[in-house]
Each structure stands twice: as C-alpha cells, then as structure tokens.
Amino acid sequence: MSLREFRKAGHPPTLAAAFLYFDVSFMVWVLLGPLAPFLAESLKLTATQKGVLTAIPLLGGSFFRPILGWMTERYGGRRTGLIGLSVSLIPLALGWQLANTYGQFLALGLLLGVAGASFAAALPLASGWYPPEHQGLAMGIAGAGNSGTLLATLFAPRLAQALGWHSVFGIAMVPVCLVWIAFFLMAKDAPGARVTKQWKDYASILKEADSWWFCFIYSITFGGFVGLASYLSVFFHDQYHLTKVQAGDFTTVVVLFGSFLRPVGGMLADRLGGYRMLLVLLTGIAVCLAGVAMLPPAMAALGLLAGAMAMMGMGNGSVFQLVPQRFVGRVGILTGVVGAAGGFGGFLLPSALGAIKDRTGTFGLGFAVLAFVALAGAGALLGIGRIWRSQWDAESARRAGLYTGGEACEGYAAAE
C-alpha cells in the first residue's frame, strides 16, 4: 500500500474534517483533567473525589456514544457531527458562567461526554470512504484527533493560572465554533444508501461474543489512554509535587506519544494485522505500567508512561483495523458499542487510582492493577485467536494477522 493509492482511495477533505471534529471534541472531553489540580484546591477535594471528577466525563462519553452511533447510522456522520459540536458548547457555557460546586461539576462532566461520543460519528464518517485494505490508516488518521488532549493539557493550566479556571471554559468555546464551520464546509457522507439500524440491532450485536472481546481490549487501549490523559495531571502534581503547569506539561509529553502514534498503529496493522500488533502492544503496556507501579523518579515515570501511552495509541488504531474485518457493514454500530466500552474503561481507571490512593496512601498498587489488566488482555487475546482462526473467512483472517509462520502461507493460499 502506497500513500498515493491511499489518497486516491477515499475523500481527503472528509478525513480531515473527521480529524478536526475528533480533535476539538477530545480537547473538550478531557478538559477537567488538567484543570483538576486547580478545582481540587478550590473545592478541597479528596483523592477519591479528584479521581471521580476527572473520570465522570468519560462515563458520560460511554452513555452518549451508542446514541451517536445510532444517529450516525440513521442521519449520517456529517449531520451527527454538527449536532455533537453544537451540544458540546452547553457544558462549556455552564463551566464558564455557573459551575461552582463539586456536584455541579459532576453534572457538567456528564454533559462533556457528548464530546467524547464524537468517536461514534467521526470514525464511521471517515471509514465509509475507504476500502478494507486502507481502513487501518484511515481510522488511525481520524482517530489521531485524540491529540486534542494535548491542547487541553498544554494550554488549560496556563490559562487557568493567568485568567482563572472559569475563563478556560469560555475560551474553549472558540475552537469548537471554528471547527463547526470547517466541518460544515468539508465533511461529506460517503455515497450509498444508509441502512438504518434499530436499538434491537445493538442488542443483537452484543449477543456475539466477539463484540465483547473487542470491548474488553478497547477498554484497555483506549480506556487506558483517555483515563491516564485525564488523570495524570493529578498524579504528577500529587506524587511528585510538580506545579500545576508542570504537571500539565508532563501530561502533554505523555499524551503526545499516544496521540500521534495512533496512525502508525493503524498503518502497521494494515501490513502486519491488528491481532498480531495487539499481542505485542498489550504485553508492552503491562511492562511499562508495572515499572510505574514501583513509583520511580519523575523522569523515569515520565518515560515509562510515554511508552505505555505510545503503545495504547497504536493499540487503538490496531483495534479498529480489526473491526471492519469481523463486522462488515456494521462498523457504525460496533464503533458506538466498543467506544462506549473504551470510555467506561477510562472512567474506571481514574476512579480506581483515586480510591486506591485514598485507602493505601500510594499510587503504586493502582498502577500494578492496571499492569495486570493489560497482561490479562494479552492472554485473553492469545486464547481467542485460536477460535477466530477457525471461524473467520480466510481473507479477513489474513488481513487481521491471525496467521503466523507456516499458517500465514496457508492463509494466503486460502484467501486466493
């Protein structure tokens, strides 16, 4: 696959629009994370409360993602994206003008989940323009919009320190409005009749065991990425006593690796197979998080977390290289379901780290638990791969990278 072939295969303006939509939505979705040290100081929050505060938008994202997935199937990704961007302005306006208590911020955080639900519209919008052999890179580029997290972690602490945290919410409305205009002008739904799904279709897809495996793996890769992106400002500030701005900068460095390596993960998954990639990546994530569990010096923790996030980002691209191979014609629905699982995994991560910190006085045990979950994911994937090899058609199995060694030759022959 060459980049020239990739450009000719789809619709670059729509791919760019999907990226921008996802990017600014991610910025909004995780905004409470880099602001958490400021809010915790102002509201006198415990470690558990800080964990829940940074996690609640992720729970909101889990709730709204199936809804936006259904809307994408029914109304198209373009219209759904415009609605999502419009609704995302509401919690920003509330944070700017009204929110002053912990309870109000929890309600605001749930509404921020609409921005997190952008996943269910942006990825099918981009995916619809590209054939299966280009899905990994297309989904990776659109999904690299999770780099919007960088905008939040880099600028939100500085703006909060200079202008007050209320102002940050108002300022964030500006890029949302600009992206709305760009999305309106650039995005275009892929040709072809849309097949409208009913809520029973979501229930039906959940009856298939493979959908649960995708949910579990994605809750580790994407859930780990967004959960850490939202919580690391608190971790660096509380564990290493960095200033609020320094904690945001450390988080920015970590998120940088995960965001921009997502397309690389998609590209490698197109060539090597998403299954093969995930086996390596999940194991690597477990090793890095186990290192963080030892609470090494700040710079060592920074390097280990950057490594973990890089592999989580590549894992996100790899998961969605697998989805079209297994669920042909149902990418929109499964994207919503799997995305919801990823968001829920992200919600559990900060909540668990905060609660464990309150009960044990250390972050170490929390990161050890995360390492174990990642390793369990690799083990589960290794086992389910044997079943997939016997159930999937030869061409899909070949693209997924389910064949190894001599099996690869047999798989290629069967596909031909």
What feature does the model see in each segment?
Residues 108-145:
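Cytoplasmic helix-loop-helix junction between adjacent transmembrane helices
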Residues 272-319:
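C-terminal transmembrane helical hairpin of 12-TM major facilitator-type secondary transporters
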Residues 32-36, 210-260:
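Extracytoplasmic gate region of multi-pass secondary transporters
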Residues 173-193, 377-385:
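C-terminal membrane-cytosol helix-exit motif in multi-pass small-molecule transporters
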Residues 63-101, 269, 275:
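Conserved MFS/SLC helix-loop-helix module at the cytosolic interface between two early adjacent transmembrane helices
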